[in-house]
Amino acid sequence: VPGVTVGHEMVGVVEAVGADVKTVKPGDRVTVNVETFCGECFFCKKGFVNNCTDPHGGWALGCRIDGGQAEYVRVPYADQGLNKIPDSVTDEQALFVGDILATGFWATRISEITEEDTVLIIGAGPTGICTLLCVMLKQPKRIIICEKDAVRAEFVSKHYPDVLLCEPEECEAFVKEHSDHGGADVVLEVAGGRDTFQLAWKCARPNAIVT
């Protein structure tokens, strides 16, 4: 919407609450969910809050109402969209919870990863690293990351030495060489590039899960 201040990844301090808000109070440090949602419609109850049918639901912050780059933000359905930050967690540590880490968590959850799987993650940017952290919780047999940026690849190599690395040009052959069934059992495409979606399918084994 023209004139709306953008921004949807944020943490903040509650300044005031509406009469129906029960879970947070002024002074609380909170994370802010990337999407607003009612929690009561068909899609919310199924966990697909991005498809909330409420007029105030969906992509509101930074799209229809002022977002995180504004000094003050109004968050509809604050009981669903705000989460208190523990005193032991800094604002910087909590920042990714509302969107990027949640993206990796949800992608991992719906990918049905098992301990026997070879998992390919395409992209090692912030979303890719958050996805990696969530995938590691599933303890798959093998994790491969495809990343063309040398700095990002070096970061992965330094901090996650057990993760295999390859570049896009060699990715298909590398994955097939390092998998047990002709390709990755699970592919998570988090790069969003022009060719990465097609690459994901090329690297997946028959009947694989591509997210």
Which residues fall in each region the model found?
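Redox-cofactor binding/interface segments in oxidoreductases and associated redox assembly factors
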Residues: 32, 121, 189
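Glycine-rich beta-strand-centered segment in the early N-terminal region that forms part
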Residues: 1-45, 86-89
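Short, well-ordered alpha-helical microsegments
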Residues: 23, 128, 196-197
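Mid-domain Rossmann-like dinucleotide-binding core that forms the NAD(H)/NADP(H) cofactor-binding site
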Residues: 84-169
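NAD(P)H dinucleotide-binding glycine-rich loop of Rossmann-like/cofactor-binding domains
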Residues: 40-122
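Buried hydrophobic positions in well-ordered alpha/beta secondary-structure cores of metabolic enzymes
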Residues: 12-14, 27, 41, 73, ...
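Conserved beta-strand positions in the Rossmann-like core of class I SAM-dependent methyltransferases
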Residues: 15, 143-144, 211
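Glycine-rich cofactor phosphate-binding loops and adjacent beta1-alpha1 units
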Residues: 111-115, 136, 153-211
